[in-house]
């Protein structure tokens, strides 16, 4: 009887603990905290958003989200090396932010560091899984630069299956197009 009562109390304790404990990660809390700046980026007010996230980084130097969004602003302002720095800082604080890998890969690609870009896109594909096709498309573009054409074609086909129209357009261009055989009339 005592064991049943203790088991029941333990289950009640677990239920209360589950519902009363905060389940948000630090990144989720930061996204909510920096909602104003994120909206500025979405509204394409990049300079204002950069100032916002620059202040956020100064006030919250341990915030991966602040570094990540400042890095995204740097990328949009074509400050690729600064973007790489900010995104590297964000990843060193929280290595689960998938967009950081994608953005850092784009920054590496923009400065013609294709091997590093491919590595970042590969990590982005792993983190994003099959939720967004742009990681597959960017990995394919980096693979083209590295002369990995067949793997690039597979990535582009995967991106097309996920709904990426840009990947479809890339598949219609060389080196993926094959010439049609010429039929001669005799």
Where are the predicted features?
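Alpha-helical tetratricopeptide repeat
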Residues: 1-186
């Amino acid at each position: 009887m005592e064991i049943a009562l203790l088991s029941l109390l333990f289950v009640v304790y677990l239920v209360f603990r589950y519902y009363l404990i905060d389940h948000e990660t630090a990144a989720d809390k930061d996204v909510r905290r920096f909602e104003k700046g994120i909206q500025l980026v979405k509204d394409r007010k990049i300079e204002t958003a950069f100032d916002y996230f620059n202040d956020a980084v100064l006030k919250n130097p341990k915030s991966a989200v602040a570094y990540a969004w400042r890095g995204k602003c740097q990328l949009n302002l074509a400050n690729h090396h600064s973007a790489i720095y900010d995104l590297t800082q964000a990843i060193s604080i929280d290595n689960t932010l998938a967009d950081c890998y994608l953005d850092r890969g784009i920054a590496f690609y923009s400065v013609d560091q294709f091997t590093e870009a491919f590595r970042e896109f590969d990590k982005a594909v792993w983190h994003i899984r099959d939720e967004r096709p742009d990681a597959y498309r960017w990995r394919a573009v980096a693979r083209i630069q590295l002369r990995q054409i067949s793997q690039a074609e597979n990535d582009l086909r995967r991106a097309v299956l996920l709904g990426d129209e840009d990947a479809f357009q890339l598949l219609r261009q060389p080196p993926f197009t094959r010439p049609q055989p010429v039929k001669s009339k005799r």
